[in-house]
A protein has these predicted regions:
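FMN-binding flavodoxin-like domain, especially the glycine-rich phosphate-binding loop
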Residues: 1-36, 40-133
Length: 133
């Protein structure tokens, strides 16, 4: 079984959350959705793989750029865990949006998580998150 993390983490908070979740997964390969030089349509995930997809929630939705790039990846029925990372305010419909995109791309969603990270603009909100709490 191969393990992947598909990330969009412009300020690093989402990446920290994803690392905490996948720290015991063997040989995780990272696909960075913020890369401007990557052909995301070239990714074909093996069907027996486990994939973590993590994105921030900005204004209750996932960034459209991240959704558009994620939609290009062929999930090939790989099992997928979704993570919406938010700054202790709200994550709105981010997980629903991610699930719709994952299903359309051929992933099999098995779990969804909302996780708190330090707010990217107002750092007093969820300061220091994620942490052991």
């Amino acid at each position: 079984m191969k393990c992947y993390q598909i990330l969009f983490s412009p300020t690093g908070g989402t990446e920290k959350v994803a690392a905490a979740i996948t720290q015991n997964w063997p040989g995780v390969q990272t696909i960075d959705l913020s890369s401007t030089s990557t052909d995301f349509a070239s990714f074909f995930i093996e069907s027996g793989s486990l994939v973590l997809v993590a994105m921030p929630s900005f204004g209750d939705v996932a960034p459209q750029l991240a959704i558009d790039r994620f939609a290009q990846i062929n999930g090939n029925r790989a099992k997928c865990v979704l993570v919406a990372v938010y700054g202790n305010r709200a994550y709105g419909s981010t997980l629903v949006q991610m699930e719709d995109t994952a299903n359309a791309a051929g992933f099999q969603v098995i779990a969804a998580i909302s996780a708190i990270a330090e707010h990217s603009i107002i750092h007093e909100y969820a300061a220091g998150r994620p942490n052991a709490e």
